[in-house]
Swiss-Prot record:
A divalent metal cation binds at residues 96, 106, 145, 175. Keywords: Cytoplasm, Heme biosynthesis, Metal-binding, Oxidoreductase, Porphyrin biosynthesis. The active site is at 106 (proton donor). Homodimer. The lineage of its organism: Bacteria, Pseudomonadati, Pseudomonadota, Gammaproteobacteria, Enterobacterales. GO terms for cellular component: cytoplasm. It is found in: Cytoplasm. This is Oxygen-dependent coproporphyrinogen-III oxidase.
Amino acid sequence: MKPDAAQVKTFLLQLQDNLCQQLSAVDGAPFIEDAWQREGGGGGRSRVLRDGNVFEQAGVNFSHVHGDAMPASATAHRPELAGRSFEAMGVSLVVHPLNPYVPTSHANVRFFIAEKPGADPVWWFGGGFDLTPYYGFEEDAIHWHRTARDLCLPFGEEVYPRYKKWCDDYFYLKHRQEQRGIGGLFFDDLNTPDFDHCFAFMQAVGNGYADAYLPIVERRKAMPYGERERHFQLYRRGRYVEFNLVWDRGTLFGLQTGGRTESILMSMPPLVRWEYDYQPEPGSPEAALSEFIQVRDWL
């Protein structure tokens, strides 16, 4: 079947609506929408919930950009895209909770298609979701990964292990030699066996995020915490910033190609701190995190 970009766009807009409704229902605070247009073609809807009861900041962004030619930075590695018009669309979200016992989460699903007359379109899907705890709870990690595995199973036994490994490899801070969190799923360049199969998988990932994350939020959001836990949470959020600005391909691509800076940097935590040569107290819950985020088979 020929790729149907309009069908993908309809799903993504509905996904953004659903996610905002689900997150608002947990928090009680509304999302504020900021609709924007891109000079070169396209636009999007950025939605942000700030200073909520549960979420210090949650951003859910939809974008759909198109143009007559790919930027040079995008065709350098894919010469087959040169001279083609393109469409790129996706939903991405990052949730930074207030309570340090609730992990930060990130999800993204996207579709890309480049066309020129007389040639087959070049297209693919990408996406995934990952979890960044500040205090590790095994039952939360198991639930997160079990949900990821279960949504992958209809697409093949090998899908979850492959995309889990890709996620572990991708969300790695090379300069710190540590994982960003406990991973989840990450996939890109998905275009086989056909459009319908790939689109169905992207939908499963997009819809599966809330099933994976919201039960963890409900379980942890009322846990009492103090200044010490908040202090550690803000310190660890620094790793999130480091990853996004130094290693994340999507952030770098967006900034280098004149993307909408406010939407691209919506993933940043509202408050964060660094501390020179910080060492957690040996044997403390804070010290246990480095062991907890080591790559492992959670299931």
